[in-house]
Amino acid sequence: MIDDDGYRPNVGIVICNRQGQVLWARRYGQHSWQFPQGGINPGESPEQAMYRELYEEVGLGRKDVRILASTRNWLRYKLPKRLVRWDTRPVCIGQKQRWFLLQLLCNEEDINVQHSNTPEFDGWRWVSYWYPVRQVVSFKRDVYRRVMKEFASVVMPMQESVSLPRSSYSYRRKRS
């Protein structure tokens, strides 16, 4: 489903732990990392799409998280011309996204990025709150900056109430 301007409606998901760190996922078979995200199906609300994508990409359900915030507006990014599929109709030039900030309620061992037949990710790790803004692929960077800035007032008090351990930069694979 592509809108009249060529943007695909999509949801993005920022999952934080009680220390205010965020889940950073490695794209399957690639060296790039990002937050979970995915398209909104026809007839689906952004919140419904978020819960579906949460399960598909991270293996978590409603009971495993709490919604702390969502972005007020749709945020857009354009795909680089080399990634646009010009032979499809309608042509998708980018994504418009509604973002959700979730707090993890379950044990982190319940996170399973490889539970589906076609996983989006092959590993994940906790990183400091602002780390993704510097590390995401360049064409998504402005959206990530805006999302993290909007959610900062919710997450920063969590970080202040707990002494933070250093972020681990080794990533986790789902156990076989």
UniProtKB/Swiss-Prot annotation:
Residues 6-149 form the Nudix hydrolase domain. Its EC number is 3.6.1.-. Its cofactor is a divalent metal cation. GO terms for biological process: mRNA catabolic process. Keywords: Hydrolase. NCBIfam families: PRK00714.1-1, PRK00714.1-4, PRK00714.1-5. The keyword RNA-binding does not apply. It comes from the Bacteria. A motif (Nudix box) lies at residues 38-59. Accelerates the degradation of transcripts by removing pyrophosphate from the 5'-end of triphosphorylated RNA, leading to a more labile monophosphorylated state that can stimulate subsequent ribonuclease cleavage. This is RNA pyrophosphohydrolase. PANTHER family: M7GPPPN-MRNA HYDROLASE (PTHR23114:SF17). The keyword Plastid does not apply. InterPro entries: Nudix_hydrolase, NUDIX_hydrolase-like_dom_sf, NUDIX_hydrolase_CS, NUDIX_hydrolase_dom, RppH. GO terms for molecular function: mRNA 5'-diphosphatase activity. It comes from Photorhabdus laumondii subsp. laumondii (strain DSM 15139 / CIP 105565 / TT01). Pfam families: NUDIX. Belongs to the Nudix hydrolase family. RppH subfamily.
